Amino acid sequence: MTNIRKTHPLMKIVNNAFIDLPAPSNISSWWNFGSLLGICLILQILTGLFLAMHYTSDTMTAFSSVTHICRDVNYGWIIRYMHANGASMFFICLFLHVGRGLYYGSYTFLETWNIGVILLFTVMATAFVGYVLPWGQMSFWGATVITNLLSAIPYIGTNLVEWIWGGFSVDKATLTRFFAFHFILPFIIAALAMVHLLFLHETGSNNPMGIPSNADKIPFHPYYTIKDILGVLFLILSLMLLVLFAPDLLGDPDNYTPANPLNTPPHIKPEWYFLFAYAILRSIPNKLGGVLALISSILILILMPLLHTSKQRSMMFRPFSQCLFWILVADLLTLTWIGGQPVEYPFIAIGQIASIMYFLIILVLMPITSTIENNLLKW
């Protein structure tokens, strides 16, 4: 008799995705982040659900409802901080996952990669609207500044901003709709993640060497289930260390002050995971130019398959490209640091240089380096 997991219509899908899936025998721990992102998403949906039971999306009570969750709800503080710091863990896993894709040439799976970029945008949108909900100073002014960027769009900009606000300023209507978006988007992310996985399983996983691995496959379970569980343990350990010992380490103290439209904080800045894009936005003195650079900094990932000029898929055997990749990582860390600094000398200049370097490395230096490496293969 055939095993039920191979015949049952529902279990068959799970079986083909997580149990009997043929996986390359040499994929490293860099391939763990897909499953970790899945765990992060489940964790965020569950903690978010319990927070939504006590949260009120009204300008008068939003701030106090978050305080009420932390003070009066049973284990409300841990749920709140798991949700807030869970977002940080989510983005750490996301950046490492994308970095892995760039390093090992996984972007040649076009459908998987493009849906991944859409997922990145969706997660960023979710995090942005979520940051507005506690209705602290940084929530309010972050929402005001970022939504205001849309006014840079010629002709329809101002109307668009007021349409998103639901009025002439960030107010009750804005908060209510942002809560609605923040509730629905994670489920859209979950659906997109399934499509992401569907397309990945059409081709099978890439591997560190970037060569076909059809001749050497092993079942996903037990090998990679055990390996993933180890990753999950590390994820939960680091998250709980953050939540229990330094819950406000990555937050902004300004967000413990209730939103006040009459008082602008001295430094308006987003959460740490948006700082690199914020630095690129600020490095251009023109409003529309800054907005275009901001969008391009993420959208540039779509171009990666077109910019791939190397005869080898992975960077494993390409030392020059490896150097460039790590320079790019250092550049992104520099941008992240600059995004959190005040707009004054020397930070403005450093930000502008780092922004130019970011686009220069991806659009010009990487394709040229790959071509040089191709010619070196002939020797």
Curated annotation (Swiss-Prot):
The gene is MT-CYB. It comes from Capreolus capreolus (European roe deer). Its cofactor is heme b. The keyword rRNA-binding does not apply. A ubiquinone binds at residue 201. Belongs to the cytochrome b family. Binds 2 heme b groups non-covalently. Coiled coil: none annotated. This is Cytochrome b. Component of the ubiquinol-cytochrome c reductase complex (complex III or cytochrome b-c1 complex) that is part of the mitochondrial respiratory chain. The b-c1 complex mediates electron transfer from ubiquinol to cytochrome c. Contributes to the generation of a proton gradient across the mitochondrial membrane that is then used for ATP synthesis.
